[in-house]
Design a protein with these regions (language model features):
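Active-site metal-binding motif and surrounding structural segment of the metallo-beta-lactamase
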Residues: 29-31, 42-85
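Acidic/polar short surface loop at catalytic or gating sites that assists cofactor/ion binding
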Residues: 85-108
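Intrinsically disordered, low-complexity boundary segments flanking structured domains
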Residues: 1-2, 70
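Conserved beta-strand hairpin/beta-sheet module of binuclear metal-dependent hydrolase folds
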Residues: 3-50
Length: 108
């Protein structure tokens, strides 16, 4: 996973494995906001570990820009965070994301 500090309080992450998927973190004085998660668990866990170790703030919110697995399936790695998304994003996660996740679980 690639990581870059974009500005004083903004970090950019990019998957090394899947489709150059990107995610971001906006850091405040007491907590952080994650914008999308990465495609693979190891990469999203790497983001989380970086935030906890290097930035020393909890993630309070995760914003999903859309429902695709490579942007939203990592939500589960931020259990204390509130997930924010458009209502249609939630509907599509339920309609399409949940069946896709079940299929992936059966295949692995």
């Amino acid at each position: 996973m690639q990581r870059e500090r974009v500005s004083e309080n903004v970090y950019w992450f990019q998957s090394d494995v899947y489709a150059q998927v990107t995610a971001g973190v906006i850091v405040g004085p007491q907590w952080a906001v994650v914008v999308d998660t990465l495609a693979l668990p190891d990469e999203t866990l790497g983001m989380r570990d970086f935030i906890e170790r290097e930035l020393s703030v909890p993630v309070r919110y995760v914003i999903n820009t859309h429902y695709h697995a490579d942007h939203a399936w990592g939500n589960c790695f931020f259990p204390g965070a509130t997930v924010i998304a458009h209502a249609r994003c939630r509907e599509l996660l339920e309609e399409r994301g949940r069946p896709s996740l079940e299929t992936a679980r059966r295949q692995n």
